[in-house]
Amino acid sequence: MGSSKLLSLALLLVLLTHANSASETSFNFTSFDTNKLILQGDASVSSKGQLLLTKVRGNGDPTVDSMGRAFYYAPIQIRDSTTGKLASFDTNFTFSIRPYSNNENSAFGLAFALVPVDSEPKRKDYFLGLFNKPDDPEAHIVAVVFDTSSNQIEIDMNSISPVARESCHFHKYNGEKVEVRITYDSSKKNLRASLVYLREQSATSSTSSVHMEKVLNDWVSVGFSATSGLYDPTSETHDVLSWSFSSKFSQHTTSERSNFLLNMFL
């Protein structure tokens, strides 16, 4: 076999290996590491390894008009441009939101979001650092919002007007640990978010049909964004305590990509 064919074969093997490894991404934070995160705005990691999305005072109380975002340091592929197929994903995290003096009128909440790579923070308040205007077709964002102003779980797509919502009385459980699971089934285009307050096992869920390919770029950043109220009685903390994430293209999609690469060299 000639040297050029050997080189081509070696390149093909590298590409096939990369194609298969790129089909799946997973990580797990039981304690957060700043080296594995992109921190924006007021977001920080505490000495205990907790992700603090908004600023807190020395005594742990929230500060007003604070906004922070935190994303996994590496981009995640959500769509394969070769096959047009989408990845499914599953993410689990725990968080707590504690209002100032246990006030029941705190704002504005926290969101799990898929945003464009290299995205910068946007407006505060109920925009949650994700949007600059109420409706923005060019935002390329899908978010699951835990809206403490309206006491509901929302699914947002390029807009602060939700495509799905479900009531959730956040202020009934001030400061308690919340466990969240969000799944996306790419074959059914189904996005589901479920929330459980661990102490009372009180559960809420919201589901919507989401065509990710119509909203998101092929590669995204995944993570969190939060904003706090404009004065003390409406301020609140937004702490993420743990986070795991996994995404995967179907085996059929991986095979299609491998066949495409093979055909390039035949």
UniProtKB/Swiss-Prot annotation:
Keywords: Glycoprotein, Lectin, Plant defense, Seed storage protein, Signal, Storage protein, Toxin. The keyword Signal applies. GO terms for biological process: defense response. It comes from the Eukaryota. Residues 1-21 form the signal peptide. Glycans are attached at N28, N92. Gene3D superfamilies: 2.60.120.200. GO terms for molecular function: carbohydrate binding; nutrient reservoir activity; toxin activity. The keyword Glycoprotein applies. PROSITE patterns: LECTIN_LEGUME_ALPHA, LECTIN_LEGUME_BETA. Seed storage. This carbohydrate-binding lectin has toxic effects on the important bean bruchid pests, Z.subfasciatus and A.obtectus. Belongs to the leguminous lectin family. This is Arcelin-4.
